[in-house]
UniProtKB/Swiss-Prot annotation:
Organism of origin: Caenorhabditis elegans
Span list, region Disordered: 324-351, 673-723
Compartments, as annotated in UniProt: Membrane; Apical cell membrane; Cell junction, Adherens junction; Lateral cell membrane
Membrane topology: Peripheral membrane protein
Record's protein name: Disks large homolog 1
Biased composition (Pro residues): 330-339
Domain PDZ, chain residue ranges per copy: 202-289, 361-448, 510-591
Compositional bias ranges of the Polar residues kind: 697-715
Effect of inactivating the gene: Mutant embryos have elongation arrested immediately before or at the 2-fold stage. They display a large vacuole in the posterior region. RNAi-mediated knockdown exhibits epithelial defects including vacuoles in epithelial tissues, cytoplasmic leakage from tail tip and the ventral surface, and abnormal adherens junctions with discontinuous and disorganized ajm-1 belt-like pattern. Widens the intestinal lumen but has no effect on the apicobasal polarity of the epithelial tissue in embryos. Reduces electron-dense subapical structures in the intestinal and epithelial tissues.
Family statement: Belongs to the MAGUK family.
Length: 967
């Protein structure tokens, strides 16, 4: 290739980007989209190649533990991937292939020598035939990425400690439709005195209307023939919470229910613990690890307790008679969900469109509330007469479907991760959706909306009851199973009424009912802390439903003359239970109040579930984030024995903080494991010694907040590269001192620099893509690198301005052009995380703009000051990933800037004065906002090292739950 051709090739991607920007006319959308895919794919492939080479250098070539032969083998693997071409990094499962079996025990070796390589194995998603039959010709001699099927890369590690406990960690790198995903599954257990391995598992179930859904036997008064007194699970009931959760197995041993020990106890103790456990139940299970272990037989004495009913302690014992069954009664486990291969199940999206119009594919990422929608329909459970399709009947607030915005009530779900739902049963559709991973691909057919009422009156339909532990009374006994909620922890089955919505008066109204065999047919909640008694659910086909006069959201005021306006839940339940026919009710419809109550209870429930799933921390425990680096070897005085070092951002579990000088703590790893106990300096010691050090060296600089005079955003130092203009030109106010949001910052008047030592933190589940804020050295360069390298994951947000649009500018793309007065009001109402004025025009970043980027599944790159971090946390309840780049000197800033600017011909080099000014500014930022950083990056050797650590932190902090400041 000639030198001239080489130069043209280097500029090719820039030329394509420039051409893409010119496609603004209507009709160019498809061409523009395809060109953007070309650009994104190229950059993604380039990034993968660079990361491969970086890992090869860091982990293999620099390793002193690997032989030359091992290094050569790793080099060959990289060659295979690189020579595989662009498709090596972009394999996707073909839409026309059949469903793959991901449960095979056989695996395909990674390379052609068929030997195990240190716990790694390669599995072709197509099954054994593809793995070994075709694999010898294709998979084994080519890159594992170069295939049209879904692949797994497994790594399994086992650790056994001296005390008999073991831990097995399985790491899978999965090639999904959305790219490579790393999934980690951990199993823990113990080895008993007989050398038998037991696997331990903690699960959380929500009773809802379906109950726990399993039966138990055993106990000290009902031992097995060999004397085993354990509490065993004898059956898992179809439609119950245990089956929906999927983790409990038949023959599991229950060792604890919430905080009640169930080992070496009578059968009645376990039954009572489960009955009184409340709506959210935490279970500790153990099972034999041995695969050859046979299921327990039926030779148990006593009774088997059937735990399907969702009753609470307020229900009388007489109502529980139906829940006890003899062990002689045959119990058949539910059959596995069928796999359907209808005539449409193997079609591509394009082929679907020929038979089903308005089809499209959407990807959802589960959050704290799961997929966030309800379904109805299926064979034998038609939602629309003559139609067995699966319909979306409700979109759950703040769920993944609502955040995505494309799924609507009335849409049909045709496929889930290539599993066809055509002509399937309702139960199978639920199981398929329940067993999906964090990222779910749906093939949907958009509905016309003709058979669904999507107006505000839809609230009159029966809604999902929000259940509070020990505060729900069930007045029916029938099975309700025509609609399934797919929100996180939501009840499994709820009926969907076909009754048309009607107007309901808001004043108190009399209602007369006659009890039937199934009671009155509605549920009540409330009655605690002076709350009204609400009707939370109306059973379809029940007495209340058929009357047409009882609605979800009604407040129960009287029952047969008994006033319930200030009654407790127990008093209301007794009044309803003792009421004779006919039953005279006084109801008042209060939809707004009920929605507030429902939201409050749902938040409480989600908090309980989230805390239980993440391993609820003991109240006596204290978790902190370190806000400084600590090296025991640099202690001026003699450090105690077992001193433990740590870095900024490390999470520490404080075990003992009674001493004024030294604390006992354990370091918490990313996977939740904790190190051995060590000794760390106390908060008091750290702060006292730091203040003494500052006094000795007369350390007076940086005591003021960055405020408005120190140009905290740092944008004025941009040097005009084309990519940087996407940030800097949109915020010219950074050159002005008129920073609106900073006028009232209390931190600007702080007389003494704070000393950052430890910050109390707690875990919080998140269901959104977190924005990213880079602070410190070269943050402008790094922001540009993130957006340019991976625009599918990172994006800037559209700012607001009060100035009129210029030629070529488009509202919603370049800026949101708004009225100045309205923008000033929004700033006062805390709707902006940062705003300022330039040449009498306002510029700013709104909270909604940040959310818009997150709803697209991308990290919003924010070029803002540290004050914006506080505003995001306090005003928007958004926890950004804030990374501080800490330089060691001004010279290091010059070197890193030079490395980042190597391939940018339109950038001039940073001067020494600019580097020194930026170094001083970094020092002030650290002193002012040191408690707001998620992580700090220091002691780096190259620009690539910085970028690698930034990517690593963002990836790690994108997983839920996260550690957030505890207030």
């Amino acid at each position: 290739m000639s030198h001239e051709s080489s130069e043209k090739a280097h500029k090719a991607i820039e030329n394509v980007e420039d051409y893409c920007q010119t496609l603004t006319r209507h009709g160019n959308e498809e061409l523009r989209t395809n060109l953007e895919r070309v650009i994104t794919t190229f950059k993604s492939n380039l990034m993968h190649s660079l990361l491969d080479i970086h890992d090869l250098y860091e982990q293999t070539l620099l390793s002193e533990r690997k032989s030359d032969a091992e290094k050569n083998m790793e080099v060959r693997r990289v060659i295979e991937r690189l020579e595989g071409g662009p498709h090596s990094y972009n394999s996707r499962p073909a839409a026309t292939t059949s469903t793959s079996n991901y449960n095979l025990s056989s695996t395909t070796p990674l390379i052609s020598d068929l030997r195990d390589r240190g716990g790694f194995s390669y599995l072709n998603g197509g099954g054994l035939g593809n793995g070994l039959g075709n694999g010898l010709g294709n998979g084994l001699l080519s890159s594992p990425y170069n295939s049209s099927s879904t692949h797994y890369l497994h790594e399994r590690q086992r650790q056994t400690s001296h005390d008999g406990t073991w831990r097995e960690t399985t790491t899978r790198t999965v090639d999904t439709p959305s790219g490579l995903e790393r999934r980690v599954v951990e199993h823990t257990g113990v080895i008993d005195d007989h050398g038998r391995k037991w696997e331990l598992e903690n699960i959380v179930l929500e009773k809802g209307h379906t109950g726990l859904g399993f039966s138990i036997t055993g106990g000290m008064d009902q031992p097995t023939e060999d004397g085993d007194t354990s509490i065993y699970v004898t059956n898992i009931i179809e439609g119950g919470a245990a089956l929906a959760d999927g983790r409990m197995r038949k023959n599991d041993i229950i060792t604890a229910v919430n905080n009640t020990n169930c080992e070496n106890v009578k059968h009645e103790v376990a039954v009572n613990a489960l009955k009184s456990s409340g709506n959210v139940v935490s279970l500790s299970l153990k099972r034999r690890k041995d695969e050859a272990f046979l299921p327990i037989g039926g030779n148990f004495g006593g009774s088997t307790s059937y735990l399907r009913s969702g009753v609470t302690p307020s229900v009388s014992a007489g109502n529980l008679q139906h829940a006890i069954h003899s062990p002689s009664a045959p119990i058949h486990p539910p059959p596995p969900p069928p796999v359907h291969h209808g005539s449409l199940s193997q079609l591509s999206v394009g082929q679907y469109r020929s038979t089903r119009p308005n089809t499209s594919v959407i990807d959802l990422v589960k959050g704290a509330r799961g997929l966030g929608f309800s379904i109805a329909g299926g064979q034998g459970n038609e939602h629309v007469k003559g139609d067995t399709d699966i319909y979306v009947t409700k979109i759950i607030e703040e769920g993944a479907a609502e955040l995505d915005g494309r799924l609507r009530v009335g849409d049909k779900i045709l496929e889930v991760d290539h599993h066809s739902l055509i002509n399937t049963t309702h139960e199978n559709a639920v199981n398929v959706l329940k067993n999906t991973g964090n990222r779910v691909r749906l093939l949907i057919q958009q509905g016309t909306g003709a058979i669904f009422n999507d107006s505000a009156s839809q609230q009159f339909m029966p809604t999902t009851p929000i259940l509070r532990p020990s505060s729900v009374q069930d007045y029916n006994r029938s099975q309700m199973g025509s609609q399934s909620h797919l929100s996180y922890g939501g009840p499994l089955n709820t009926s969907y009424s076909s009754q048309a919505p009607i107007a309901i008066p808001l004043e108190p109204r009399p209602v007369q009912l006659v009890k039937g065999q199934n009671g009155l047919g509605f549920n009540i909640v409330g009655g605690e802390d002076n709350e009204p008694i609400y009707i939370s659910f109306v059973l379809p086909g029940g007495v209340a439903d058929l009357s047409g006069n009882v609605k979800t959201g009604d407040v129960l005021l009287e029952v047969n003359g008994v006033v319930l306006r200030n009654a407790t839940h127990k008093e209301a339940a007794e009044a309803l239970r003792n009421a004779g026919n006919p039953v005279y009710l006084t109801l008042q419809y209060r939809p707004q109040e009920y929605q507030i109550f429902e939201s409050k209870i749902e938040k409480l429930r989600n908090d309980v579930i989230a805390q239980s799933r993440m391993g609820t921390l003991s109240r006596k425990s204290e978790y902190v984030r370190a806000l400084f680096d600590y090296d025991p070897s640099r202690e001026n005085s003699v450090a105690p024995h077992r001193s433990m070092g740590f870095n900024y951002g490390d999470i520490l579990h404080i075990i003992n903080s009674s001493d004024d000088e030294w604390w006992t703590a354990r370091k918490v790893h990313e996977n939740g494991e904790e190190t051995a106990e060590g000794v760390i300096p106390s908060k008091k010691r750290v702060e006292k010694r730091e203040r003494l050090r500052r006094k000795q060296v007369n350390f007076n600089s940086g005591s003021q907040s960055l405020g408005r005079n120190s140009s905290t955003t740092g944008l004025e130092n941009r040097r005009g590269s084309r990519s940087q203009l996407s940030f800097s030109r949109k915020f010219p106010f950074v050159k002005s001192t008129d920073r609106l949001n900073d006028l009232n910052e209390e931190s600007s008047n702080v007389a003494e620099e704070p000393v950052w030592s430890y910050q109390a933190v707690e875990q919080q589940a998140i269901n959104y893509v977190r924005p990213v804020i880079i602070l410190g050295a070269l943050k402008d360069r790094i922001n540009d690198e993130l957006v340019n390298r991976d625009p599918s994951k990172f994006s800037s947000c559209v700012p607001h301005t009060s100035r009129p649009p210029r030629e070529g500018e488009v509202n919603g793309r370049d800026y949101y052009f708004v009225n100045k007065h309205n923008m000033e009001e929004d700033v006062k109402n805390n709707l902006f995380i940062e705003a300022g004025q330039f040449q009498n025009n306002l510029y700013g970043t709104s909270i909604q703009s940040v959310r818009d980027v997150a709803n697209q599944g991308r990290h919003c790159i924010l070029d803002v000051s540290g004050n914006a971090i506080r505003r995001l946390q306090s005003n928007a309840n958004i926890q950004p990933i804030s990374i501080f780049i800490k330089p060691s000197s001004a010279q290091q800033i010059l070197e890193l800037d030079s490395q980042l600017a190597t391939n940018r011909q339109d950038d001039r080099a940073m001067s020494g004065e600019e580097a020194q000014a930026q170094y001083s500014r970094c020092h002030r930022i650290e002193q002012t906002f040191g408690d707001l950083f998620t992580q700090e990056i220091s002691n780096v050797h190259s620009a690539n090292d910085v970028l690698s650590k930034v990517y690593s932190i963002i990836s790690r902090e994108s997983q839920t739950p996260i550690w957030v400041p505890r207030h």
